[in-house]
């Protein structure tokens, strides 16, 4: 390798500095890969290349890592800092067959034998000039821009045309101390290291570029030849009394309507546009958990991303983040309503495939769509779909639509060998541009059809949107899930492949709810969501600034000391910092008087801010319920509070997709924190500390509307034990409207008919809606809910229920 200060290398680095833009994956190798700067470090690369090492040098200089040009000197032994598994490829002929890397490995291992305290980190580094996966029928382009083993001439073309899309990827370090201690230091171990490294680089390339792209027409021809689709075409011809040719043409039309037409060129252009867009819109995008998903890709999993759906931005944000995290953007299931010009063709070339809102018993369309989805899985493309079916208008997760999850499950049952893993993804924003539109729709305005004019209108309103949040939740591998739900599923399918298992539909429902729960498990508590939570719990949506900051400090402490899950992310900084962030985003107003500053939510913004509160209300609903128990009862005991939480938790779990596994432990941890923070004391009973009672009262406000809903339901059930489910839903909704009108409740979800439907289903499942004469459980929960309400609200509910007619 030429010396770092040689004229040749200086010239090469000067050229690359002007032609090359390098993206590092992961963005923070120290944090994501746990690199230890106190230990010696060497790099392993697949191929020796001056341009690759020059690009690596630029990156290591910025990151504070050792330069690849500096030799590694340990215990008097000098070794190259970079070990390359194969030499440079000449312009003509084959590269030399010698293996100098084995000598390097042997020298490094031998030093570990001499010095037991030594532990060199061997860090694999992959470089990619562009990320085109190539096509199954590539010819000339592949020859000119061959990426796997380019000659120096081809590498020049790659730098010239693809230099702005250079990726340098660091992988987890290998401990040479571990290798020496566990496997020895002979030549056999050096060979093993080389084999493992080659496999790693091969897998890493597939993760970064994805599988080869098919010719679209060839894909259609392949799908139409499949046995299941041929059968569906024949059945369509018989049922519609048309020829098989006409039926086949219909199937082709469906395929053309559905199928993506992925274009790497468009993705590269979109990357530049989206980089500009995110920099204009957001001050930062916070990501948590990407490294684990990258490892799943590396291990050969078929990945299906299942994000929550807040905004049309979701389609762009997740794909962009995955691209920058060294993974291939997924094929996205998009609603057919988005297939309008010019967005539809662009989305399609970006990987979107389109799905109708309803299949309406169309067996041919169903067969075509299922076969296309199976093909995506079979070829190794990652897939993304929104299990909610549409964007949430309230900020809460919607009840899942199970169609896509069922089709994914069926693909596994039909024989996919690789593990298929669902990855729940929480997407959050400090500002959702559609929020105002959502509330118009909730108030009765008809939803506008998507069009190019809406796109222009949205672009015109672009501004400072704060930060975005992408948190990857705990993955669910479907084969493992099936083993849990039906241990003998493989044998059952082998006996009768055509018979739909009786356990399949219940299993799909369990899976859908588990996905939603794990999305909420990965929630992001941000400045906007936390401040909205606190202000909306106050009487006038306003608090003294110092009190608000103190309340947010309590919330931050609660989330950090009693974490909801390990996948949840919490905003950095203290309460003072969070309040200022929200003010800077124009989400909250500040007024002053001689006694100090007051932070408030404008009256015309209060409904909109419930959207952001609802994103994280599940994180605080149990602590809020505990606070309500403490503030409404002068003397409380732990067992009483645990019992109350246990009674309400099944309903909270159903409507908020919560996944707390050990309620008594969680409740006791929260109570212990309250004691530590000086909010309560404990002797024989739990007592609120008077001077800090305002913090608990404010915290309890977050559960008040939920308790009011439960009080409505259980007062109705206790008063009319034989009430039918449909009757309970309609009368609960009617009484909620009355309560809202009398007591100024404006949160949209309070009047959501679907929410009362969800609760009634859960009530029936729990046995509260039954013909049993014993209604003691219903009356107990009614009394508990009533005891935690303000007297005026309780009086309204009881009086309305006991009246002859609700009006």
From Swiss-Prot:
Identify the enzyme class.
Answer: transferase
Give the matching Pfam families.
Acyltransferase, GPAT_C
Its pathway is: Phospholipid metabolism; CDP-diacylglycerol biosynthesis; CDP-diacylglycerol from sn-glycerol 3-phosphate: step 1/3
> What is the protein's major site of localization?
membrane
Alphabetically ordered keywords of this record: Acyltransferase, Cell inner membrane, Cell membrane, Lipid biosynthesis, Lipid metabolism, Membrane, Phospholipid biosynthesis, Phospholipid metabolism, Transferase
SMART domains in the record: PlsC
Localization of this protein: Cell inner membrane
User: Which GO terms of type biological process are on file?
Assistant: CDP-diacylglycerol biosynthetic process; fatty acid metabolic process
**Reactions the enzyme catalyzes:** sn-glycerol 3-phosphate + an acyl-CoA = a 1-acyl-sn-glycero-3-phosphate + CoA
CDD domains per the UniProt record, alphabetical: LPLAT_DHAPAT-like (cd07993)
The question of whether Acyltransferase is a record keyword is answered with: yes
Residues forming the motif HXXXXD motif are: 308-313
Q: Which domain of life is it from?
A: Bacteria
What GO CC terms are in its UniProt record? plasma membrane
Stated membrane topology is: Peripheral membrane protein
Enzyme Commission number(s) from the entry: 2.3.1.15
List, in alphabetical order, the Gene Ontology terms for molecular function in this entry: glycerol-3-phosphate O-acyltransferase activity
What's the entry's take on its domains?
The HXXXXD motif is essential for acyltransferase activity and may constitute the binding site for the phosphate moiety of the glycerol-3-phosphate.
Q: Which family does it belong to?
A: Belongs to the GPAT/DAPAT family.
Q: Please give the name of this protein.
A: Glycerol-3-phosphate acyltransferase
Biological source species: Shewanella sp. (strain W3-18-1)
């Amino acid at each position: 390798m030429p010396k770092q200060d040689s004229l040749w290398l200086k010239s090469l680095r000067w050229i690359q500095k002007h032609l090359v833009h390098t993206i590092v994956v992961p963005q923070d190798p120290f944090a994501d890969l746990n690199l230890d700067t106190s230990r010696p470090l060497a790099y392993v690369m697949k191929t020796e290349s001056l341009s690759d090492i020059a690009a690596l040098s630029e990156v290591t200089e910025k990151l504070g890592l050792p330069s690849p040009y500096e030799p590694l000197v340990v215990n008097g032994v000098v070794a190259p800092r970079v070990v390359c598994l194969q030499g440079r490829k000449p312009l003509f002929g084959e590269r030399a067959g010698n293996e100098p890397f084995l000598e390097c490995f042997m020298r490094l291992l031998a030093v570990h034998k001499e010095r037991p305290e030594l532990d060199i980190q061997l860090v694999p580094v992959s470089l990619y000039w562009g990320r085109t996966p190539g096509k199954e029928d590539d010819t000339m382009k592949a020859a000119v821009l061959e990426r796997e083993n380019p000659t120096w001439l081809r590498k020049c073309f790659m730098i010239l045309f693809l230099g702005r899309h250079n990726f340098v990827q660091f992988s987890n370090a290998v401990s040479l101390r571990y290798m020496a201690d566990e496997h020895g230091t002979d030549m056999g171990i050096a060979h093993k290291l080389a084999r493992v490294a080659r496999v790693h680089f091969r897998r890493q390339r597939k993760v970064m570029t994805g599988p080869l792209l098919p010719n679209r027409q060839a894909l259609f021809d392949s799908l139409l030849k499949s046995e299941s689709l041929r059968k569906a075409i024949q059945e369509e011809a018989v049922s519609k009394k048309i020829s098989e040719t006409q039926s086949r043409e219909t199937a082709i039309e469906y395929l053309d309507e559905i199928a993506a037409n992925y274009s790497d060129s468009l993705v590269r252009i979109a990357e530049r546009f989206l980089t500009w867009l995110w920099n204009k819109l957001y001050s930062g995008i916070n990501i948590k958990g990407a490294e684990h998903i990258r490892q799943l890709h590396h291990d050969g999993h078929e990945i299906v991303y299942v994000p929550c759906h807040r905004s049309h931005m979701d389609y762009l944000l997740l794909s962009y983040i995955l691209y920058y995290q060294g993974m291939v953007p997924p094929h996205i299931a998009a609603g057919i309503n988005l297939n309008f010009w010019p967005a539809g063709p662009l989305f399609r070339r970006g990987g979107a495939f389109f799905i109708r809102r309803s299949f309406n018993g169309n067996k041919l369309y169903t067969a075509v769509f299922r076969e296309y989805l199976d093909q995506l899985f079979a070829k190794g493309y990652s897939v993304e779909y929104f299990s909610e079916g549409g964007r949430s208008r309230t900020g809460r997760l919607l009840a899942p639509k199970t169609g896509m999850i069922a089709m994914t499950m069926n693909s596994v049952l039909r024989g996919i060998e690789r593990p298929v893993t669902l990855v729940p993804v929480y997407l959050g924003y400090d500002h959702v541009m559609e929020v105002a539109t959502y509330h118009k729709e909730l108030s009765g305005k008809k939803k506008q059809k998507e069009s190019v004019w809406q796109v222009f209108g949205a672009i015109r309103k672009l501004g400072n949107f704060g930060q975005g949040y992408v948190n990857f939740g705990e993955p669910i591998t479907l084969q493992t899930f099936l083993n849990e739900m039906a241990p003998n599923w493989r044998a059952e399918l082998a006996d009768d492949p055509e018979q739909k298992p009786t356990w399949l539909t219940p299993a799909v429902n369990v899976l859908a709810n588990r996905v939603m729960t794990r999305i909420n498990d990965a929630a992001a508590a941000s400045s906007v969501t936390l401040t909205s939570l606190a202000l909306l719990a106050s009487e006038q949506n306003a608090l003294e600034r110092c009190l608000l900051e103190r309340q947010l400090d309590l919330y931050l402490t609660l989330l950090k000391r009693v974490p909801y899950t390990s996948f949840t992310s919490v905003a950095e900084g203290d309460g003072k910092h969070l309040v200022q962030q929200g003010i800077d985003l124009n989400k909250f107003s500040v007024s002053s008087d001689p006694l100090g500053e007051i932070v408030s939510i404008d009256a015309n913004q209060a409904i909109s801010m419930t959207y952001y509160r609802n994103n994280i209300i599940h994180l605080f609903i149990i602590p809020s319920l505990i606070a309500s128990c403490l503030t409404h009862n002068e003397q409380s005991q732990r067992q009483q509070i645990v019992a109350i939480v246990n009674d309400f938790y099944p309903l909270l779990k159903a409507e908020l997709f919560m996944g707390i596994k050990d309620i008594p432990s969680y409740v006791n941890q929260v109570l212990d924190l309250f004691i530590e923070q000086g909010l309560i004391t404990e002797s024989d009973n739990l007592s609120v500390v008077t001077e800090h009672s305002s913090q608990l009262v404010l915290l309890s406000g977050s559960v008040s509307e939920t308790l009011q809903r439960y009080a409505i339901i259980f007062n109705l059930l206790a008063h009319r034990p034989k009430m039918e489910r449909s009757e309970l839903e309609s009368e609960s909704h009617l009484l909620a409207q009355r309560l809202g009108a009398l007591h100024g409740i404006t949160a949209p979800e309070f009047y959501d008919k679907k929410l009362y439907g969800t609760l009634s289903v859960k009530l029936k499942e729990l046995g509260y809606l039954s013909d049993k004469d014993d209604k003691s459980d219903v009356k107990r929960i009614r009394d508990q809910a009533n005891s935690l309400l303000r007297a005026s609200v309780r009086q309204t509910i009881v009086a309305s229920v006991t009246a002859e007619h609700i009006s």
